[in-house]
Amino acid sequence: MVHEQIETRGVRDPRVLEAMRTVPRHLFVGAEWISQAHADCPLAIGHGQTISQPYIVAAMAEALELTGSERVLEVGSGCGYMAAVLSTLALQVYGVELEPELHERAVRILARVGCSNVSLACGDGAQGWPEHAPFDAIVLSCAATGIPAEPWLQLAMGGRIILPMGAPQETQELILVRKTPRGSRITRMMPVSFVPLRKDRDLPC
């Protein structure tokens, strides 16, 4: 999977490639999708959400340029797959998921695979996780029409936030934004399609 789907498409960071080899994606998908667990496509995980395709996960992780000393926040942690990948690349990972059932599933799976440096919360990811800020990097695993204000405030100076930018049911653009003393520096990466960011008014936890 890693060579054909990820490395040949330009992902070169050896730590990211090793993470994609070692994190068992099949444990994060439903039983009905086991046969496609290593296919390079998103798969439904219930509640209108998906586990992202491996190439996109790898590309997002590589773009953050993690060295192993960072504190990373994931907004929309879903079943926990991205958090598991990030856990091999960062010092500490924090994930916030709005849907209670997915949150509970992620807690179980991450415990099973031994991700001891991941902390998960059930709540509104659009509010970030202020108790653990500042973060060196933030991942939005859901599409937004702009950078959510609270996570941006919780991002350390020089930190990076990566997110799919665009409206639901439209092709979005994956962008990387670096926080600078003068504001921000944006890198546009590729077209993507993600489920939209949901807030607590859509589904209380």
Model-derived features with residue positions:
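Conserved alpha-helix/loop element of class I SAM-dependent methyltransferases that forms part
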Residues: 3, 7, 32, 37-41, ...
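Short clusters of hydrophobic/aromatic residues that line enzyme substrate/ligand-binding pockets
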Residues: 28-29, 38, 43-45, 129, ...
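N-terminal auxiliary segments of SAM/dcSAM-dependent transferases
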Residues: 1-32
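Short, compositionally biased strand/turn segments
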Residues: 1-6, 42, 124-126, 131
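Class I S-adenosyl-L-methionine
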Residues: 184-205
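Active-site/binding-pocket entry motifs
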Residues: 26, 35, 44, 183, ...
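Conserved nucleotide-cofactor-binding alpha/beta core module
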Residues: 65-185
